[in-house]
A protein has these predicted regions:
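Charge-enriched amphipathic alpha-helical scaffolds
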Residues: 2-17
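Short, charged/polar, Gly/Pro-enriched secondary-structure boundary elements
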Residues: 28-36, 530-535
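Low-complexity, highly charged intrinsically disordered N-terminal segments
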Residues: 47-139, 143
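OB-fold/S1-family single-stranded nucleic acid-binding modules
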Residues: 23, 518-543
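Electropositive polyanion-binding surfaces
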Residues: 1-5, 52-55, 68-72, 132-506, ...
């Protein structure tokens, strides 16, 4: 019996042949099997060596060049992966933590960037060589001198403004948008690049542009020369601030100045505009635009109220990130400055007007639609519908074609109308019910959301780095809702478990217990309640109504799931393609560093974001800063 057991346990030397019978393995098979055993033993020895090196804090030579494959898309059968998992378990770390500890990745920041690039830019973030000629010499001259308003770090200048003062209490306002569509054709190599990226990716200290640098340089509205533009001209009654007529042109515009909010915000204030004071370029134009912007803003507020929403309310500060190596400087910037409002309202007006323009000529475009309440209330679609959060009848992203593909698509369609009028439906790149247009809608929404998630993560990362850098042991925060708080000094929100019941706006002193840059996590506990706001009955009722609306939205989510389960195309109606809410909507208040565990928030006034034009290519908006990309400005040092 013992012999039988030993033979049975040596399959290399003996093969089973029937019940209780064994046959000696042929010599050739035996040699091959023994060689395989030796290779396996050798691999085990190599793997053990890898484990020993990793546990000792040294990255084995064989791991160089394989780090991202091991961490992002591993082959779990390789000895490198098995060694990494074994060593990480032995040291009580994750695999990424161990690789950083061994010097395989420079820092947690590098890990976050490498993982994002590996997933969304597997071929790298560079561009192939491109050739492009600007059609500026072929375009009619607008005969105006325009100016842009942007943050000092902005390089992709999409929009500019001109003002002409007319008799009879009227003025002509020109909204001039960079026109890369004039040099890019659908399906050409540059279009393929832009469609592959769909948007510029923003994050503190850096960005990954949608278009190659030569294209941006050819079409950005840089001061000191004529630039191709798609212009929207509005004749405005300066007494009532009503838009009398509008006109769209394709032309070249002379850009006189690139104004910078960093320099002008201290000068261009509500008080200085009221007194018509200050020494800065285009003062008369900005003074004339200020009451128009206020009137446009108030009109949208009345529409919001009619939609069952409250008026927009903005927090007092925005935040700019300045990155120098691994050091971060987070500076507060006054929110809601007059220049912000002017740029915001004119951009909302342009996107709404051009949305109606597309619909009037029956040319499809890509619209943002939003219901005031309900689940999945924000969607992108190819037919016009109200954006109740912004308080406009329709809204088509059109003012950031250098950094967002949807705007480039809409610009192609607008140019077709401007040049061909009623025949535009026949010559526009995208026809009604175009399957390619539907594909762009769906692909853009998914990609844009992923980019925004990475932006939020990196904003949160730099907030944690700032706390560590400043050696903060405590910080002051305000209650947002439930266990969620918002820090006062930095744009950081997080959930503090067991916080207790506090009114919204209550100021708290928090103890900072732990900072984890790799997992982008912060642990805090309540140290002291500093002060609590006085809550009026009206505010309490409004908050209760919001809570009830959120509860109703959750209940209605089952209906959306049922629609999602329908066969492809069954849920489409008149050219509508539903998609999840994208960044910039009130649902996630793009730009606020939101805890990924945080629940989606209703379109509360507290979630309104207004920012400078680098982070805010279109506008700041409420009910969801729709058209907003990142909300914070992300200066790139050294550029």
């Amino acid at each position: 019996a013992a012999l039988a057991l030993r033979i049975h346990g040596a399959p290399v030397f003996f093969r089973r042949k029937g019940r209780g019978n064994y046959q000696r393995a042929p010599e050739e098979q035996l040699k091959a099997a023994l060689a395989a055993l030796e290779r396996k033993a050798e691999l085990a020895r190599v793997q053990a060596g890898y484990v020993d090196a990793l546990v000792a804090g040294t990255l084995p030579e064989a791991f160089h060049g394989k780090i991202m494959d091991l961490l992002v898309r591993p082959d779990k059968n390789t000895i490198e992966f098995k060694a990494l998992e074994t060593a990480a378990a032995a040291r009580g770390m994750t695999a990424a933590q161990l690789v950083i500890a061994c010097g395989g990745i420079e820092s947690p920041r590098a890990w976050h960037q490498m993982r994002f690039v590996a997933e969304f830019f597997p071929a790298g973030t560079g561009f192939p060589p491109v050739s492009l000629s600007s059609p500026v010499d072929e375009l009619p001259d607008a005969g105006v001198e325009a100016f842009s308003i942007d943050d000092i770090t902005t390089t992709e200048i999409d929009d500019a403004i001109s003002v002409e003062h007319l008799p009879d209490n009227r003025m002509r306002v020109g909204i001039h948008i960079a026109a890369p569509s004039l040099g890019i054709a659908t399906g050409d190599p540059i279009d393929e690049i832009a469609r592959g990226r769909l948007s510029t990716v923003y994050m503190p200290g850096e960005k990954i542009t949608m278009l190659p640098a030569p294209v941006v340089e050819a079409y950005t509205l840089q001061e000191g020369g004529h630039r191709p533009a798609v212009s929207l001209y509005l004749i405005v009654d300066t007494t009532t601030h009503e838009v009398v007529t509008s006109e769209t042109r394709v032309e070249k515009v002379f850009i006189k100045h690139n104004l910078r909010t960093n320099l002008l915000d201290p000068i261009v204030t509500v008080e200085s505009l009221a007194a018509n004071e200050g020494d800065y370029p285009h003062r008369a134009d900005i003074v004339a635009l200020w009451p128009l912007a206020q009137a446009l803003h108030e009109k949208r507020q009345q529409t919001r109220i009619a939609n069952g929403l409250r008026r927009e309310m903005q927090r007092s500060a925005d935040f700019n990130f300045y990155i120098d190596g691994e050091h971060v400087d987070i500076q507060q910037r006054r929110r809601g400055a007059p220049l912000d409002l002017i740029v915001a309202e004119l951009a909302i007006l342009a996107n709404s007007t051009w949305g109606a323009f597309l619909a009037e000529y029956g040319v499809p475009g890509i619209y943002r639609a939003q219901r005031a309440f309900g689940p999945n209330r924000t969607r992108m679609q190819t037919s016009p519908a109200p954006h109740e959060g912004l308080g406009v009848a329709q809204y088509a992203w059109s003012t950031s074609p250098l950094r967002r593909y949807v705007d480039l698509v809409n610009q192609w369609q607008l140019v077709a109308i401007a040049r061909h009028g009623v025949a535009a439906k026949m010559v526009a790149p995208f026809k009604p019910k175009d399957a390619d247009l539907y594909a762009i809608v769906q692909g853009f929404d998914e990609t844009y959301a992923a980019y925004a998630e990475h932006q939020h993560k990196m904003e949160r990362f730099w907030c944690l780095r700032w706390l560590k850098q400043e050696a903060r042991k405590q910080a002051v925060a305000q209650v947002v809702k439930g266990d969620m708080v918002r820090f006062e000094e930095i744009p950081l929100q997080l959930i503090v478990p067991g916080l207790g019941v506090h009114a919204r706006g209550t100021r708290l002193l928090l103890d900072i217990v732990g900072i984890d840059e790799l997992n982008v996590d912060l642990s805090c506990r309540l140290a002291q309640v500093l002060d609590a706001p006085v809550v009026s009955a009206e505010d309490a009722a409004a908050e209760a109504a919001e809570t009830a609306a959120e509860t109703a939205a959750e209940t209605a989510a089952a209906a959306d799931e049922a629609v999602a389960a329908m066969p492809d195309g069954a849920a489409d109606d008149a050219g509508v393609v539903t998609a999840a809410a994208a960044p910039g909507d009130a649902d996630d208040a793009s730009g606020t560093s939101v805890d990924p565990r945080a629940p989606a928030q209703a379109p509360a006034a507290e979630d309104i974001e207004i920012a400078n034009a680098e982070a805010l290519p279109d506008v700041a908006a409420a009910g969801g800063a729709d058209a907003v990309e990142p909300v914070h400005s992300h200066p790139v040092t050294g550029t």
